[in-house]
Amino acid sequence: MRKRISTTSNQPSERTLQSELFGREVQFNYSETWLAYSMLGLRLVMAWVFLQAGLEKLLDGGIGDPLAWSSAGFLNNAVPEANPLHGVFLFFAEFGAIVDPLVIFGQILIGLALLFGAFFRFAALMGAIQMFFFWTAAWQAGVAAGLPVENGYVIDSSFVYMLLLFGLGAWGAGRLLGVDRYLEETELVKQNPSLRFLLG
């Protein structure tokens, strides 16, 4: 994919992005300022979504029982039998001792990473994978039925979150007032450019 960004002459705060999308040349103008604000805003919103979800699960049983929350009830009962992956989620339910901490602490760590813009692309990828599992668990039936979800077809909040995380990672939103901006200047990253794929 070819991408070129150039500054327009009459509006210094606007830029033009030219790229190729599905084999066609596309271009659009955007405001640098508003793009930065919107990326930062979306990043903080997604950080809150994950952090709140993880902390609610962690504190479900109170301070004295931090791992009282269990995914088993959801995996055993909430995934419809018509869901083509029903058996997969029943299998996961057998391993609550592994799945529960992964979900709880995964959500908290993803939320913190998004909040502080640290290892952003890695965190966004992990969050998108988690949202993918939540999305597939919401299927009421299979492809032949149109992939119905709770309030419609195909698209639900998990799907939207998954796409938002993909977009934020693609734009490198972790560099906006984030730790990744400084991590990229370290000697370790400069000597190992592949680490940049985890940052940004």
Residue ranges of model-derived segments:
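Extended, low-polarity transmembrane helix blocks
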Residues: 1-79, 85-109, 116-200
